Amino acid sequence: MEVVVRFFAALEAGDIGTLREIYAPDAVIWHNDDLVEQPVEENLNVLRGLHRTVSGLRYDIVRRVPAPDGVLQQHVLRGRLPGGAEVELHAAMYLRVRDGRITRIEEYLDSGKRATIKAAREAASGKR
C-alpha cells in the first residue's frame, strides 16, 4: 500500500523521476477507453503532458482497498484547464505491485472527460 501512496504523491507533484523508480521496468499501463497497454516511458510522457495541461492537479481518494497482489482504488482527478475551466475525472484503478514496484495498472475512466483533457493538452501544444 505504501508504494501506491508514494505513487499518487509523485503524480500530484509531477515528479517523473520518482514515478519512473516506482514503476517496474517492464510495467504496463492499460486504459479502458483505448485498450492499449502502454510501456512505462510512453505513460510518463502522457503524465508529463497532463501536468503541463492541468494546474492544481490532485487526486481525491474515494476508497483504496488492498488486493492479494496490489491495490484497488477509486478516485477523482481534479484540477484546472488552461482556459480556467475546472476538470473532474472519476476513475477506478487496479495497481498490481510486486517487490515494492508497480508492475501493471488497469485504469477505468470516463473517456469523454479524458478526451477533454487531451484536447486541452493538444491545443496548448499547438497540435490537432
Features from the language model and the residues they span:
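A beta-strand edge to alpha-helix "cap/lid" segment located at domain peripheries
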Residues: 45-128
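Short, low-complexity N-terminal intrinsically disordered segments enriched in polar/charged residues
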Residues: 1-25, 119-128
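Short, mixed-charge, low-aromatic patches
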Residues: 1-7, 30-34, 49-52, 74, ...
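Generic alpha-helical hydrophobic packing signal
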Residues: 3-10, 17-20, 35, 88, ...
